[in-house]
């Protein structure tokens, strides 16, 4: 997903008052679907736009995002899928590394910052 697509989704959800979570990959080890800096948005209804894995982590991230929104507190998650015996995460689809993801709430009470300002600057940088 491109940055512009992510921003369009953000603007759409924000205009409808949807609380959301910005999930950012901040570290990886080994083979992972995405690398540091990759982001997805997760809505309060567990809808998400983008992927940080080949589909093996997004469901869990959506559940964690719900807790992040309830507490209005960020959360750092580590998913270690390097153990071949761990079929829960790896699923044999290229998710056999370690990935660390930072989840931060984007809510109306703080004007969806810091992503609101980032989106504004990116959309006007042409």
Question: Where are these predicted regions, by residue range?
Answer:
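Segments forming oxygen-rich coordination pockets for charged ligands
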Residues: 1-126
